[in-house]
Amino acid sequence: APEVCAILSRESGALLGAVGLQPSSEIFPELSATEQREMGYWLGRPYWGHGVMTEAATELLRFGFEMLGLEAVWCSHYDWNSRSRRVIEKCGFRYQFTKETTNVIGMTNKTVFYALKKEEWLAFSGEKEFA
């Protein structure tokens, strides 16, 4: 089942966005869908550029690797979405490949895919190995 979290304002409790982990085996065929997840997110435009999504994504990765026992997480962004690219880079993901994709309304985009394995996350984040 997907794990989805609301991102709320610390001050007002207002909804700012959401971040989630969806079971998927698209990137690492050697891992089951329970060992890897796709990370997705959205953030309301007024909250862009304040580090909100990077903080939320970092905490979701910690949850995924520590609590769910994931071996890998992957994510993607359209090639024109530089803000999403920066979130992904700040979280330690590594580039995998780019391919053309078509969304649900029929728009074609170049989609850039990234992945992060547990051992890479541990090294990048400075977290200690967990039991």
Task: Show the residue positions of the predicted features.
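Acyl-donor (CoA/ACP) binding surface of acyl/acetyltransferases
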Residues: 4-131
